[in-house]
A protein has these predicted regions:
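Nuclease-adjacent, charged terminal/linker segments that flank catalytic cores
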Residues: 1-96, 329-332
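Hydrophobic transmembrane signal anchors and adjacent membrane-proximal interface regions, especially
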Residues: 2-4, 10, 82, 86, ...
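A residue-identity detector for tryptophan
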Residues: 92-95, 171, 185, 245
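Active-site beta-strand-loop-beta-strand hairpin of nuclease catalytic cores
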Residues: 167-169, 176-188
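A short, polar/proline- and glycine-enriched secondary-structure boundary/capping micro-motif
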Residues: 47-50, 97-105, 198-202
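Long, compositionally biased intrinsically disordered regions
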Residues: 1-39, 247-332
Length: 332
């Protein structure tokens, strides 16, 4: 069980300055709440924790929080957002030999920057007959049979050698997208930046945000064996989230001091970060409330909920216990 913060876009980004405060406060709150509670109790609770103290207590990977664009795509599919579903259905039907009117998604890589690969109820969604289609000649792979090996391969390169050669890159998948009635699926990679799409054996579908002024045509990449499927998304909204994430991370890495310019070179980013530096001696929850007051009004609606995400990895505790998922208004 992990905590999920859905940051749902309600309006367009009007002011980058105010928008950064809008996204920083749920990110910072998520990181603060991800601290181990026994450590928080030792100082008498959050009421005794300053922002600067938090940066010294925080250990990356020791109860962490991640931004997850993959979840935004996954959520749009399972919530049956018609604009997104139509795009996915076209890609599956025309290019992946998976016909049907009700595409579905299984979230596989909930947080790739953590130390553990998560499986989101994979065993509930897959059957013993679930087939993985790779776009290559040969018999389809029975996915459930190999799912534990794929998860292990994410963490241990040596485990990749144990996978069938046709899917030895499947550990790079973010989602499995397909049709539950046909019980056919494709390994799917999700990237905010299309140039970061990479081929790997076992991957078939590449989902990227559509961009204004660019073609949103579904295409088959000539060399990567990937079907590229742009989906509606407010690109500027996503950029703001990653920019805000970087500001918070650099501030933490600098232990509440102003980060070196090489680490945070943008003038606007440094201006926003200075608000954090100037308040390092104030209570961390009070600082978060201050950040809310500086935010663009009505840009975000933050909904917190618990999510069942099961890990197939048994030799290590889950290191990521909270996900911040930016969800564009075009996807909701």
């Amino acid at each position: 069980m992990i905590q999920l913060s859905k940051c749902i876009q309600m309006n367009e980004v009007n002011s980058e300055y105010e928008a950064l405060f809008s996204v920083i406060h749920p990110i910072l709150y998520g990181l603060v709440m991800s601290l181990k509670q026994d450590i928080v109790s030792q100082i008498g609770g959050y009421k005794n924790m300053s922002l600067g103290m938090f940066t010294r207590m925080y250990v990356p990977g020791d109860g962490d929080c991640g931004i997850c664009f993959e979840y935004a795509v996954h959520n749009a599919i399972i919530s049956k957002n018609s604009d997104v579903l139509n795009r996915i259905d076209d890609a599956l039907t025309k290019y992946c030999k998976i016909k049907g009117t009700d595409p579905s998604s299984i979230l596989f890589g909930a947080e790739k920057s953590g130390q553990v690969q998560f499986i989101d109820s994979v065993m509930e969604h897959l059957t013993d007959d679930s087939l993985l289609l790779t776009g290559k000649k040969g018999q389809p792979i029975k996915l459930k049979k190999h799912i534990n090996g794929v998860a292990a391969a994410f963490r241990k390169p040596k485990e990749r050698e144990k996978l069938p050669s046709s899917i030895n890159g499947l550990w790079k998948a973010d989602l499995f997208v397909g049709n539950t009635l046909q019980d056919k699926w494709v390994g799917t990679t999700v990237k905010i930046n299309p140039s970061q799409l990479e081929s790997a054996r076992g991957l078939r579908l590449g989902i990227v945000p559509s961009r204004q002024g660019k073609s949103d045509k579904i295409t088959q990449h000539e060399t990567k064996n990937l079907i590229i499927c742009p989906v509606p998304y407010d690109y500027s909204f996503m950029e703001i989230f990653y920019e805000g994430w970087d500001i918070v991370k650099q501030f933490i890495n600098a232990k509440s001091e102003m980060p070196k310019e090489i680490n945070l070179p943008g003038s606007l980013d440094r201006t926003v970060c200075k608000h954090l530096v100037d308040r390092k001696n104030y209570n961390v929850l009070d600082v978060i409330e201050y950040l809310k007051s500086m935010a663009q009004p009505h840009l975000l609606d933050v909904a917190n909920e618990s999510a069942n995400i099961d890990s197939t990895v048994t030799d290590k505790k889950i290191s990521v216990n909270r996900i911040v998922a930016p969800i564009s208004s075009l996807m909701y």
